[in-house]
């Protein structure tokens, strides 16, 4: 998974407020696109097609599995255990 180098520094202001960024809702849209809402009230659409590589993420290229995404306590996850850090999702 490619993570932007400035990810941590960009998320610090939110952490300074005593809050940890997390996903509160997810909706499957089409292909590998998801509509996400975060606990800071910001939402948007992420396209994860280019992020589906590696042992945990390759199975998600099967759209029937990708569509089974759900929200955990902080982020999104799939039945095979694959997940993305909420900070990463917020930045893409």
Cite the ranges covered by each PLM segment.
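Motif-centric detector for short Cys/His coordination patterns
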Residues: 1-92
